[in-house]
């Protein structure tokens, strides 16, 4: 499985990269069909008009490619680590739903008459 990590308006530290790789490999250890993952981390600066103070909103986005399907999730938080945690939780729910649909699928049998 290939994991690509990019940063937009921020640099990816080794600690953040290790956190992402640990969480994503742990999340996908039961699913061997994952072809690739792309993770984009960004920092959005917002300015409050009344107080003239800015706040940074950290955004984490990911695309997970499986055979025949692409899953996308996005999460934001005040801290990058919290955004990554929210992102992996969302993707885990999507992967569990996809895996459950695959397990529930049973081809129809044609009965001879």
UniProtKB/Swiss-Prot annotation:
MF annotations from Gene Ontology: ribosomal small subunit binding
Gene Ontology CC terms, in alphabetical order: cytosolic small ribosomal subunit
InterPro entries: HPF/YfiA_ribosome-assoc, RHF-like, RHF/RaiA
Listed GO biological process terms: negative regulation of translational elongation
Keywords: Translation regulation
Pfam families from the UniProt entry: Ribosomal_S30AE
Function in brief: During stationary phase, promotes and stabilizes dimerization of 70S ribosomes by the ribosome modulation factor (RMF), leading to the formation of inactive 100S ribosomes.
Similarity annotation: Belongs to the HPF/YfiA ribosome-associated protein family. Short HPF subfamily.
NCBIfam families: yfiA (TIGR00741)
Self-association state and partner proteins as the record states: Associates exclusively with 100S ribosomes, which are dimers of 70S ribosomes.
Name of the protein this chain belongs to: Ribosome hibernation promoting factor
């Amino acid at each position: 499985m290939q994991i690509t990590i990019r940063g937009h308006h921020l640099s990816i530290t080794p600690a953040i990269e290790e956190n992402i790789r640990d969480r994503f490999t742990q999340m996908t250890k039961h699913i061997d069909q994952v072809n690739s993952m792309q993770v984009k981390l960004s920092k959005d600066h917002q300015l409050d008009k009344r107080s003239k103070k800015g706040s940074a909103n950290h955004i984490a986005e990911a695309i997970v490619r499986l055979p025949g399907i692409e899953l996308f999730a996005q999460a934001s938080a005040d801290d990058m680590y919290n955004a990554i945690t929210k992102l992996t939780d969302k993707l885990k729910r999507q992967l569990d739903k996809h895996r459950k649909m695959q397990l529930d699928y049973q081809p129809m049998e044609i009965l001879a008459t």
